[in-house]
Amino acid sequence: AALKDLTDTARIALLPGSGWPQQTGVAELEQMAPLTGSFVELGDEGCVVWSRTGKKLNSIQSGYARPALAAGKTRFVLYNRSGNELRVESRTQNLYTKQLENSIFLCAISDNGTLAVVTEDQTSMAKLLVYSPSMEQQLSWSMTSNDGTPLRMAFSPDSRKLAAAAVTVSGGQVMTNLYLINLASGDPVSLVNQGGVPQWLGWTSASTIL
């Protein structure tokens, strides 16, 4: 899959396109994310990948009731927020399709293709799963009501750490717990606990979270 990503990058850079503006085929745009040499658009009926020169690279009709996507550099994950299926896509083709045991809340994907998934959990508040770029499970964390449910996630630029902002209720107040997970060790570290709901979470450098 890594070789395929490199091949795609070289091929996309050389592909002629029709240029812009043009119709992309997405009637009602819900999300858009940049990829290397291209971008992906999500509409209510599926998503489309276009090169920066205006060449259509991929088109996916998922049939998901509540589709959402998260993107890295060369891959993106398309998932169903009303179901338990996700698809990991390169810019030109499907790499993996996975059915999880429980409904999906949220996904994030790193620049190297590491995937984080938050699902419902029968015995706790939520479960955080992390998969390698080859879809081998690296981490599983059953999160209690005190831990909260992740509402925002972001991988570090080097893809070695995952920040997660999890929302919980304490004393009638909505609180956010910010965790940092080193993927090599798998141990979550609580960084801060504060009131309110996070609107955005990201890395401004290799070591700074905003």
Task: Give the positions of each predicted feature.
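Gram-positive cell-envelope targeting signals
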Residues: 1-19, 30, 76
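A short beta-strand motif characteristic of beta-propeller blades
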Residues: 10-24, 53-61, 92-99, 137-143, ...
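Repeated scaffold domains used in trafficking and secretory/extracellular systems
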Residues: 25-32, 62-74, 102-111, 147-154, ...
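Short beta-strand elements that form the blades of beta-propeller/WD-repeat-like
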Residues: 30-43, 47-48, 68-81, 86-87, ...
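Beta-propeller blade-edge and WD-like acidic-aromatic loop motif
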Residues: 46-51, 84-94, 125-139, 172-190
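Asp-box/WD-like beta-propeller blade repeats and closely related beta-sheet repeat scaffolds
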Residues: 95-115, 119, 126-127, 134-152
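Extracytoplasmic/luminal low-complexity segments enriched in Pro/Gly and acidic/polar residues
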Residues: 161, 166-210
